[in-house]
């Protein structure tokens, strides 16, 4: 069995869109039969990103990884995001049935990510369970995923500082 942890993070404002919201996600995978430990992260330079968007990207990596490399193996994906867990275990089924509208008849946010997740979890032989874990409580996998999400934003900041470029005409 594979066990995944995923996390998302933004610098700026939690789930408030803002031009300076640089985001990142992190994910780790553990195996109970071996000492496999895979880490992945990505910074996201899109502006106006949110924590929820980054949380979804981390989850999507876990789903893709499980499907690509362990298609018939049970897995558990842990997230400290109530949004991610509730979406996967409840809301998404209603959204798909209701034309991707929320219970308040509003369009689902992050629709492209949500629909990609739906493609994964609606497969006939879907094999992942998505569970909630407490964030920042010393759970190794969650702490590692959080560190990767945070690290990805710092890498982006460092690259921006190292390669400052002015575009336009010189005076």
Report each predicted region and the residues it spans.
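RNase H catalytic domain
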Residues: 10-16, 22, 60-144
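Noncatalytic linker/hinge segments flanking ATPase motor cores
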Residues: 43-45, 115-123, 169-171
């Amino acid at each position: 069995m594979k066990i995944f942890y995923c996390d998302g993070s933004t610098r700026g404002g939690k789930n408030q869109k803002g031009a300076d919201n640089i985001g990142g996600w992190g994910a780790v995978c553990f195996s109970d039969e071996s000492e496999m430990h895979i880490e992945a992260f990505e910074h996201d330079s899109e502006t106006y990103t949110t924590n929820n968007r980054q949380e979804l990207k981390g989850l999507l990596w876990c789903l893709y990884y499980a499907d690509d490399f362990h298609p018939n193996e049970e897995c558990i994906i842990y997230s400290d995001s109530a949004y991610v867990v509730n979406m996967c275990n409840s809301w998404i089924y209603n959204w798909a049935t209701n034309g991707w509208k929320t219970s308040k008849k509003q369009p689902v946010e992050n629709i492209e990510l949500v629909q990609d997740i739906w493609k994964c979890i609606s497969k006939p032989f879907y094999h992942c369970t998505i569970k909630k874990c407490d964030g920042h409580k010393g759970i190794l996998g969650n702490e590692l995923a959080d560190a990767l999400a945070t690290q990805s934003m710092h890498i982006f900041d460092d690259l921006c500082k190292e390669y400052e470029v002015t575009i336009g005409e010189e005076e």
